[in-house]
From Swiss-Prot:
Keyword Cell inner membrane: no
Record bears the keyword Methyltransferase: no
Membrane association type: Multi-pass membrane protein
Gene Ontology annotations for the cellular component aspect, listed alphabetically: plasma membrane
Designated gene of the protein: ysxD
Residues passing through the membrane, by range: 6-26, 28-48, 54-74, 78-98, 110-130, 138-158
Cellular localization per UniProt: Cell membrane
Record key words, sorted: Cell membrane, Membrane, Transmembrane, Transmembrane helix
Name assigned to this protein: Uncharacterized membrane protein YsxD
Amino acid sequence: MKQKSILFPCLLLAASVYAWLESGQAELFSGQDQWPVLLMLLGAAFVYQGKKEAVTPHFFIGLLLFGIGLHFFAKPKWVWWPDDFEMLLFMIGFSLLVSTVQKKEYVYEAVSMICFSLFLYFFKQIMAWLESAHIPTALLKEYWPFVFIGISLLLLLIKRKKSIR
């Protein structure tokens, strides 16, 4: 007999809690009626269902939704919070790492994504440090995206051995 999924009740609960928060009947925290809160609630529902029923893709999507919601909720409140591009890449890498680390799949890809997002976050500081050490950075500032495009294309086009995973 096939077991029924708890996904629909979890999603319904998340949407209902958001509707209650948006109605303003209770003031729990500032910004409770904004759309990032809905993303976090839906993400939490997917995380719970994915963990409870061992559905890794739902767990990954849940972490990603929760992280994106958290980013857009926290960004206006804290000045030090990273920009969209860096943080979204970080959230993708973090979600992939957490959801697949038990199976030891995609760990290299997840860590690479996290490192790339950290590189982007600290890019200005790295360039300032190189310039203070009197290392020319004009070419690096202009052409670094093309280096990563080249690396990506090279990784896509080379034949992979089956022993990678």
